[in-house]
Amino acid sequence: NRLCCSQYGFCGTTSEYCSRANGCQSNCWGR
């Protein structure tokens, strides 16, 4: 499992990081 990273440079595996609606930049959920 790769970490998702937000637009602010924070990474994690929860929706806070993985959801595009929350500003995800990399390894986001969906395609």
UniProtKB/Swiss-Prot annotation:
Pfam families with a match to the protein in the record: Chitin_bind_1
Highest taxon in the source lineage: Eukaryota
Protein name per the record: Morintide mO3
UniProt entry tagged with the keyword Disulfide bond: yes
Protein role: Chitin-binding protein which functions in defense against chitin-containing fungal pathogens.
GO molecular function: chitin binding
Alphabetically ordered keywords of this record: Antimicrobial, Chitin-binding, Disulfide bond, Fungicide
Tissue: Seeds (at protein level).
Species: Moringa oleifera
UniProt keyword annotation of Isomerase present: no
Database matches in InterPro entries: Chitin-bd_1 (IPR001002), Endochitinase-like_sf (IPR036861)
GO biological process, one term: killing of cells of another organism
Free-text biotechnology note from the record: Has potential use as a flocculating agent in water treatment processes.
Residue span, Chitin-binding type-1 domain: 1-30
Taxonomic lineage of the native organism: Eukaryota, Viridiplantae, Streptophyta, Embryophyta, Tracheophyta
Disulfide pairings: C4-C18, C24-C28
